[in-house]
Amino acid sequence: MDKLIITGGVRLDGEIRISGAKNSALPILAATLLADGPVTVQNLPHLHDITTMIELFGRMGIEPVIDEKLSVEIDPRTIKTLIAPYELVKTMRASILVLGPMVARFGEAEVALPGGCAIGSRPVDLHIRGLEAMGAIIDVEGGYIKAKAPEGGLRGAHFFFDTVSVTGTENIMMAASLANGRSVLENAAREPEVVDLANFLIAMGAKIHGAGTDTITIDGVKRLGSATYKVMPDRIETGTYLVAAAVTGGRVKVKDTDPTILEAVLLKLQEAGAEVTTGEDWIELNMHGKRPKAVNVRTAPYPAFPTDMQAQFISLNAIAEGTGAVIETIFENRFMHVYEMHRMGAQIQVEGNTAIVTGTEVLKGAPVMATDLRASASLVISALVAQGDTLIDRIYHIDRGYECIEEKLQMLGAKIRRVPG
């Protein structure tokens, strides 16, 4: 198993390019199954989950054509099987996203219950209930979701999400694009990745209004055609590198990104004492060598502070001046990295869904273990500022969400290297 070794104490300085958003690319790849012609998706990040999704398509009989820039052309007309097997699905929660498109386009699907990060309960019942509202007949047996469309296809439905669900919104929106009649999704997720998926569906000919608000209206169409589409930049990768620069007292310019979808994070970085400047597709952060000030953070659905940036801000508070509270309202069990940070000397108390972080001037390098994707990013950030060497184990978690993390950090001056397991 690969490990990262990081020697801390270097002030980050430089420029990097941001990759395409994994959380946008995965639903967009799933949505290509709705097309009745070839579709090209550009700006895919080079990540394990993306490779797994493309491999899943290969198992179904679709032969994706990939170029060296990781654009992929997919022609779903060659599909031979409508089963998403457990051995592929178990490593990736996003595999549930093929359920809606397959039922809508081909009338049936068999998808293994998904795996992925071990963060609390992420139930798939909203996906199932949404499709049932559209007339699908669904059984969950033997670890598989088996779904069939009614005769004549899925029907438009009015569906209210009991809790805001990004993948639930995406799955039902995709299915509704080819359903008969109008669907209205209430309490829908407003995340930029949902908007990106809607824009891709619209590029294929879907009729969707209200993406980015909590009510999305979809008028089903008979067919969706070919399209070429560029995946949006990754706002969480963007935020992670900005926090890394802030923690080390450095300066970084991130390019090929979008400041408008990261406003809650940028405001908190300014509150921590960072100088932040933005352009149309870039953000520059400069700490001028200062130590950050501790900030209070409360996660909530977009446009509020994103849960996927919570762990990084615990790292920021751990070396900041003062004390900051980080309240997690989206997922339970999302403070697993705190116990690894204790090994580096961080002063963090967890009380329920709140982490109280008292900043310390010095963290010490130590052997630590990544527990999930974003938690592993927080360990990397802490290691960048710690005295001595930090060895991070189980970094396959990092590779699920960050493209070439060591190369990008090296470009900013970090002393980081990968050691093959």
Curated annotation (Swiss-Prot):
A Pfam family the protein falls into: EPSP_synthase
Residues holding phosphoenolpyruvate: K22, N23
One GO term describing the cellular component: cytoplasm
Involved pathway(s): Cell wall biogenesis; peptidoglycan biosynthesis
Annotated active site: C117
Keywords of this entry: Cell cycle, Cell division, Cell shape, Cell wall biogenesis/degradation, Cytoplasm, Peptidoglycan synthesis, Pyruvate, Transferase
Catalyzed reactions: phosphoenolpyruvate + UDP-N-acetyl-alpha-D-glucosamine = UDP-N-acetyl-3-O-(1-carboxyvinyl)-alpha-D-glucosamine + phosphate
InterPro entries named in the record: Enolpyruvate_Tfrase_dom (IPR001986), Enolpyruvate_Tfrase_sf (IPR036968), MurA_subfamily (IPR050068), RNA3'P_cycl/enolpyr_Trfase_a/b (IPR013792), UDP_GlcNAc_COvinyl_MurA (IPR005750)
EC identifiers of the protein: 2.5.1.7
GO biological process per UniProt: cell division; cell wall organization; peptidoglycan biosynthetic process; regulation of cell shape; UDP-N-acetylgalactosamine biosynthetic process
Family stated for the protein in its record: Belongs to the EPSP synthase family. MurA subfamily.
Functional description taken from the UniProt entry: Cell wall formation. Adds enolpyruvyl to UDP-N-acetylglucosamine.
Protein name per UniProt: UDP-N-acetylglucosamine 1-carboxyvinyltransferase
